[in-house]
């Protein structure tokens, strides 16, 4: 008797699904452990930096030189970072070197210790994908490479950020626009939930700010939400466009990576210290907290964080883009909320999820981020804003290797 096929495209049977689900438990524990270590050390280093800002940030050029040396000496294919993950997912490459794990972890810690404006989530996605892909050779499954990458990406995202449903849909939709890998939904969800639970049990805390007051949707409110979606979509587009442009232009102007990071980070250091004494260093969680808690947000906070993050990453420093995107969106939302007469915490949350969605070309993941971080009371506004943000962005993405499903 043949086992029933779940998907013609994936060629998965129920037996495959059970096997993958059992593996997902092991994967979730491993990646959750790695995420907990990575995340807790990063938080500790960031707090240490904030207490010794004027001693550490001036050493950013030296940290940059060390990062470039480590990548030049040891990286090989791993230097492609998320680009390599996407290439493997599209069967354009067949290996993710395990050395990516210590390399991207240590260099991201260095970037944050010395004040670079960068994120962490992209690193966690790489860590999860690398761990999971290492096991794919032991499983005789059709399209095993993509399946295991997807599960690992979800575990990495979910373990660090502890939004397992959002992490699941991020991994399912990000590799190819317009295509959801639904046949592997269950094992991907299991991997993400187990990783999230593991990292939480190991002391990694989740950021959440529940907004209990729900917004009543009428025509006027709908139009305001549509305008917000377009504004946040443009901000996400701007980040993705400038990041791609800056990497090309800086590399063209300063082709030697050592000169590039040394000269560029001297300028970056001055900017980080001059502009409100380190306000834009690190992840941007300070801006997120100020935005949702009603603190002081300046009109240009979002733009300065955007530009300094682009500059940091274009020089060769390591770290993800996602948490700065959250900060950019939240601070822009805090600025726009009074203009439209809407609650600041809610609009900050809408910006938080939709600038991320626009920059990554994802639709479902940001909506679930809204639900898991800010609560389900405003799920409809999340969806409306995200729909309009997604409307104006179908090709620009922080992930240059992302593909689009061709319409038949």
Residue positions per predicted region:
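Alpha-helical transmembrane segments and immediately membrane-proximal extracytoplasmic
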Residues: 1-408
């Amino acid at each position: 008797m043949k086992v029933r096929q779940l998907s013609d495209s994936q060629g998965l049977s129920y037996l495959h699904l059970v096997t993958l689900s059992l593996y997902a438990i092991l994967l979730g524990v491993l990646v959750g452990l790695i995420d907990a270590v990575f995340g807790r050390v990063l938080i500790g280093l960031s707090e240490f930096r904030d207490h010794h800002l004027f001693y550490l940030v001036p050493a950013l050029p030296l940290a940059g030189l060390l990062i470039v040396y480590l990548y030049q000496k040891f990286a090989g294919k791993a230097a492609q970072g998320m680009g390599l993950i996407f290439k493997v997912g599209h069967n354009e490459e067949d290996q993710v070197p395990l050395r990516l794990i210590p390399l991207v972890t240590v260099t991201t810690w260095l970037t944050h210790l010395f004040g670079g404006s960068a994120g962490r989530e992209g690193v966690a996605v790489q860590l999860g994908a690398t761990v999971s892909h290492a096991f794919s050779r032991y499983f005789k499954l059709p399209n095993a490479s993509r399946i295991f990458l997807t599960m690992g990406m979800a575990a990495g995202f979910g373990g660090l950020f502890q939004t397992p449903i959002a992490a699941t849909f991020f991994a399912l939709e990000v590799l190819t626009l317009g295509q959801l890998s639904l046949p592997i939904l269950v094992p991907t969800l299991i991997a993400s939930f187990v990783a999230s639970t593991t990292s939480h049990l190991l002391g990694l805390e989740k950021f959440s700010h529940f907004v209990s007051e729900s917004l009543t949707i009428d025509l006027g409110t709908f139009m305001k939400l549509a305008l917000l979606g377009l504004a946040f979509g443009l901000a996400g587009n701007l980040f993705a466009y400038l990041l791609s442009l800056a990497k090309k232009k800086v590399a063209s102007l300063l082709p030697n990576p050592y000169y590039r990071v040394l000269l560029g980070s001297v300028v970056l250091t001055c900017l980080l210290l001059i502009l409100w004494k380190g306000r834009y260093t690190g992840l941007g969680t300070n801006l997120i907290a100020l935005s949702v808690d009603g603190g002081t947000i300046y009109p240009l906070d979002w733009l300065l964080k955007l530009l300094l993050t682009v500059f940091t990453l274009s020089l060769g420093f390591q770290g993800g883009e996602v948490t700065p995107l959250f900060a950019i969106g939240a601070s822009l939302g805090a600025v726009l909320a009074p203009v439209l007469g809407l609650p600041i915490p809610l609009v900050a949350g809408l910006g938080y999820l939709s600038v991320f969605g626009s920059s990554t070309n994802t639709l479902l993941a940001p909506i679930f981020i809204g639900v898991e971080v800010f609560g389900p009371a405003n799920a409809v506004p999340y969806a409306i804003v995200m729909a309009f943000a997604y409307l104006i962005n179908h090709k620009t993405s922080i992930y240059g290797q992302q593909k689009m499903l061709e319409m038949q």
